């Protein structure tokens, strides 16, 4: 059995709420870009931003996984980087994670209105190996990569 933990160790966790989602069916590269975009935001601000991403009103800047990606209007002004996408599926899972961490914060008697994201990360999860049959008896691998997402918030 694997041993799960967080990638950040804190001395005092009394003012911090944590949450994690395991085996999310989104590639870790995409989840890492969404995590980088919301890192340091307040929870309500991150929620508004992710809803705008789902509605395709705001794009997420893709700084690492951006090969042959289009430039998006307004990204360079806000983020200083013109290349971006609208990762709707990743934003939905990140919203679910924000709901979880907000509930955990309420359970620890933290003020939900004043929560700020201090850490968010995406790590590689399991890979489901599949094979797609091709012509002449060949087969091509079709791997489905999953992600683990973790988040920590603190009351400010």
From Swiss-Prot:
Matches recorded under CDD domains: Ribosomal_L22
Keyword annotations of the record: Ribonucleoprotein, Ribosomal protein, RNA-binding, rRNA-binding
A GO BP annotation: cytoplasmic translation
Reported function: This protein binds specifically to 23S rRNA. It makes multiple contacts with different domains of the 23S rRNA in the assembled 50S subunit and ribosome. The globular domain of the protein is located near the polypeptide exit tunnel on the outside of the subunit, while an extended beta-hairpin is found that lines the wall of the exit tunnel in the center of the 70S ribosome.
Assembly information from the UniProt record: Part of the 50S ribosomal subunit.
Protein family: Belongs to the universal ribosomal protein uL22 family.
Protein name, per record: Large ribosomal subunit protein uL22
Originating species: Aeropyrum pernix (strain ATCC 700893 / DSM 11879 / JCM 9820 / NBRC 100138 / K1)
Lineage of source species: Archaea, Thermoproteota, Thermoprotei, Desulfurococcales, Desulfurococcaceae
Gene for this chain: rpl22
């Amino acid at each position: 059995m694997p041993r799960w933990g967080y990638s950040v160790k804190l001395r005092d966790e009394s003012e911090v709420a944590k949450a994690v989602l395991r085996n999310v069916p989104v590639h870790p590269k995409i989840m890492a870009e969404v995590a980088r975009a919301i890192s340091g935001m307040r929870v309500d601000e991150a929620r508004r931003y992710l809803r705008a991403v789902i509605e395709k009103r705001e794009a997420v800047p893709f700084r690492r996984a951006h090969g042959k990606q289009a430039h998006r209007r307004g990204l360079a002004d806000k983020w200083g980087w013109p290349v971006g996408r609208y990762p709707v599926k990743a934003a939905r899972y990140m919203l679910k994670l924000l709901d979880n961490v907000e509930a955990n914060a309420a359970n620890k008697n933290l003020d939900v209105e004043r929560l700020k994201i201090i850490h968010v990360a995406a790590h590689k999860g399991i890979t489901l190996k599949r094979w797609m049959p091709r012509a002449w008896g060949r087969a091509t691998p079709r791997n489905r990569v999953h992600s683990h997402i973790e988040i920590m918030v603190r009351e400010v």
